[in-house]
């Protein structure tokens, strides 16, 4: 197997989980051609495989919210570009406030969701 690997590369991404695959994908999208992705087994077969795979849309900051929206759109885009299923299933959620404090928190989240155009 080592004989198949080049001796040099500008970028070596170690780990074929969601983070490593994302880095390799985005580098390729930016035109980087001298990139290697190393994974000891199958892609996404480690920690990523064990994760629940939930992609919430509203984050604790505007940066996290933008990243989550980008990720959700990327999964949809990848399915269109490749014709392969990412396994993305969009489901809603219902949260019930059982106290006045929790109601205020949910109202704050609803306002933030509107501000960031989160559906």
Predicted region positions:
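A secondary-structure boundary/capping signal
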Residues: 14, 39, 51, 90-92
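Beta1/beta-strand and adjacent pyrophosphate-binding region of the FAD-binding site
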Residues: 3-19, 36
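Glycine-rich FAD pyrophosphate-binding loop
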Residues: 28-49
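Short, flexible hinge/linker loops that cap or flank conserved catalytic cores
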Residues: 3-6, 29, 88
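Hydrophobic alpha-helical packing residues
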Residues: 27-28, 113
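Dinucleotide-binding Rossmann-like beta1-alpha1 core, especially the glycine-rich loop
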Residues: 53-119
